[in-house]
């Protein structure tokens, strides 16, 4: 039986006149209507909608933790396979003699800025600190202690801290030390603190992004198909993608992008507002000065500023506003990192970097497929951290994937993968080791006195800076962080708006009324984030993001199968 030649033409219907000229009317209008309905539903009953979103999130955590875990493991396996398999990796994503549009520095800057730029400023300081206090190793240690106490007939006093009581029993020689017990907030918990931070921000995240990006680049530049999500499924569904099936796939990508970027911007807005409070001390920016959390008013004002700048940047295009902003925030990022390299806990951070990478690599195969019962304490930890991240990266993948494809023409699959996965992962490991490591060192040495542990997620970076410097220098450094956050927020939002326009216009870079649609989507994204903030703050945004990620997670699985089929047939 002869092998069918690959499909190299996909006729996606677009309008030839009017406001939607150049756009697929069904995808564009349906996406706008769905987003509008979500906003109306939330605003019609803010309290009730917040409760419903939270219930749906909890259902997803309870029933889809295994699915999310194995789906991401599958993405990693497929992505590494196509990169490392000799004939696959040599495949050129474009003209065999063509040269990349952007320099390696600009390309990497845009990858990093759009991919996880905002989150790293918040979580590089916060996540190692949080894991030092609570992680699977300490949870299993607690279970071991409780089992030992039960076996020895020693009752745990009501309300007593398990670890403090255990250490008291050891000191009193009434209990034999248990091998393998990891005590929270001690040096024994360092390995897990960095191992799990690297798990969440390393290969799993970037392989998910790059898998989508490679799929789209291959089918767009090597096969000549439109740069839109449905094109990546042509080996499976062929011409059927020209109709309703393809429309559904593209709509799913738009919805996932809107809610995925909402999560990222929401986190960034919280840190941005915390930074403004750290610099100015304006009371209305936070709920209370003892444990400052950004107020809804501060978040909404920050959102308005960010989205106005983002729409302006998006209108200037990838080659101008986004490129230059990406270069600026990369330079500022490395200035911030240099500050921690020079003034932070350098030797401690280097030790954590080396040990953390070793522990991460050794344990990665087991960590990516481990699933705990969501009804246990271990399962609760996994859903609130790992499953949250997997859903976030999946919801973010259509945006980052299309954006990566737009800037990666004429690179090979291996070049795309090696730079797109390894370079950002290693960069993030350095960030977490030096910024989070400095915070941990301040706590373990007693200098911080629990201040970093007690700070909110979005305030911990500024707390670390405040402990390292006098008030004047701390304000200057905090101001630089706030500016850096603003550039990351604008870069991420404007890139997302361009991606949404790309999907709606059947992969076209420029369409006649593109600027008007960019403005509409900018307003729509602002309305979604504002409505979710009113409905329950960052928790409501997280709930919506996790729900939006579910359908697109299945589409990525199909894209992976489609890419493998195409590469095998070509070879």
Q: Model features per residue range: what roles?
A:
Residues 1-23, 84-93, 152, 410, ...:
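Terminal cytosolic tails of multi-pass membrane transporters
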Residues 2-173, 315, 338, 549, ...:
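N-terminal alpha-helical transmembrane segments of multi-pass membrane transport
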Residues 15-20, 45-61, 82-99, 193-200, ...:
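Membrane-water interface regions at transmembrane-helix termini and the short interhelical loops
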Residues 19-43, 76-78, 116-120, 151-159, ...:
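Helix-loop-helix module between adjacent transmembrane segments
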Residues 20-30, 89-109, 347, 351, ...:
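C-terminal membrane-solvent junction of multi-pass transporters and transport-like membrane proteins
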Residues 34, 67-84, 333-344, 427-437, ...:
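Hydrophobic alpha-helical segments of multi-pass membrane transport proteins
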Residues 51, 55-59, 132, 142-201, ...:
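Interfacial loop/helix-cap signal at membrane boundaries in integral membrane proteins
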Residues 248-411, 418-419, 423-480, 532:
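Membrane-embedded translocation segments of transport machinery
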């Amino acid at each position: 039986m002869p092998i069918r030649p690959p499909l190299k033409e996909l006729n996606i219907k677009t309008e030839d006149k009017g406001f939607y000229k150049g756009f697929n009317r069904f995808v564009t209008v349906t996406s706008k209507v769905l987003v509008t309905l979500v906003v109306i539903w939330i605003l019609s009953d803010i309290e009730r909608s917040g409760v419903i979103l939270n219930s749906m999130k909890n259902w997803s955590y309870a029933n889809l933790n295994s699915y999310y875990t194995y789906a991401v493991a599958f993405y990693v396996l497929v992505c590494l396979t196509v990169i490392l398999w000799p004939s696959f990796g040599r495949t050129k994503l474009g003209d065999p003699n063509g040269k990349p549009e952007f320099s390696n520095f600009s390309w990497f800057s845009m990858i990093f800025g759009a991919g996880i730029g905002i989150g790293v400023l918040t979580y590089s300081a916060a996540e190692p600190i949080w894991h030092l206090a609570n992680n699977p190793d300490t949870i299993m240690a607690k279970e071991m202690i409780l089992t030992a106490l039960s076996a020895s007939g020693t009752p745990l006093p009501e309300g007593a801290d398990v670890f403090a009581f255990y250490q008291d029993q050891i000191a009193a020689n009434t209990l034999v030390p248990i091998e393998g017990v990891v005590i929270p907030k001690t040096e024994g918990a360092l390995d897990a603190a960095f191992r799990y931070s690297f798990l969440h921000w390393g290969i799993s995240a970037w392989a998910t992004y790059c898998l989508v990006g490679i799929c789209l680049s291959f089918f767009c530049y090597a096969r000549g198909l439109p740069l839109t999500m449905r094109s990546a499924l042509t080996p499976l569904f062929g011409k059927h993608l020209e109709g309703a099936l393809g429309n559904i796939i593209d709509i799913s990508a738009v919805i996932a992008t809107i809610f995925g970027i909402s999560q990222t911007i929401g986190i960034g807005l919280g840190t941005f507002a915390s930074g403004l409070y750290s610099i100015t001390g304006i009371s209305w920016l936070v709920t209370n000065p003892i444990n400052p959390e950004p107020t809804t008013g501060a978040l909404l004002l920050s959102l308005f500023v960010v989205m106005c700048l983002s729409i302006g940047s998006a209108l200037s295009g990838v080659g101008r506003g986004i490129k230059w902003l990406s270069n600026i925030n990369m330079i500022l990022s490395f200035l911030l990192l240099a500050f921690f390299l020079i003034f932070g806990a350098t030797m401690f951070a280097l030790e954590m970097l080396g040990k953390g990478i070793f522990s991460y690599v050794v344990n990665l195969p087991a960590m990516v497929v481990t699933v705990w019962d969501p009804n246990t304490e271990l399962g609760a930890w996994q859903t609130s951290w790992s499953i949250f991240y997997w859903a976030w990266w999946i919801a973010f993948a259509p945006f980052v994937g299309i954006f990566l494809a737009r800037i990666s023409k004429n690179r090979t699959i291996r070049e795309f993968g090696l730079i797109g996965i390894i370079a950002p992962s290693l960069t993030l490991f350095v960030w977490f080791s030096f910024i989070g490591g400095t915070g941990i060192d301040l706590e373990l040495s007693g200098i911080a006195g629990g201040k970093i542990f007690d700070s909110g997620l979005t305030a911990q970076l500024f707390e670390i800076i405040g402990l390292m410097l006098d008030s004047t220098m701390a304000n200057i450094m905090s101001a630089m962080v706030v500016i850096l956050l603003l550039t990351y927020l604008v870069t991420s939002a404007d890139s997302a708006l361009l991606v949404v326009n790309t999907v709606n216009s059947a992969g076209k870079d420029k369409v006649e009324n593109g600027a008007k649609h960019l403005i509409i989507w900018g307003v729509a994204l602002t309305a979604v984030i504002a409505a979710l903030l009113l409905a329950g703050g960052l928790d409501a945004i997280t709930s919506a993001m996790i729900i939006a990620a579910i359908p697109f997670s299945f589409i990525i699985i199909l894209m992976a199968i489609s890419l493998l089929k195409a590469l095998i047939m070509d070879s």
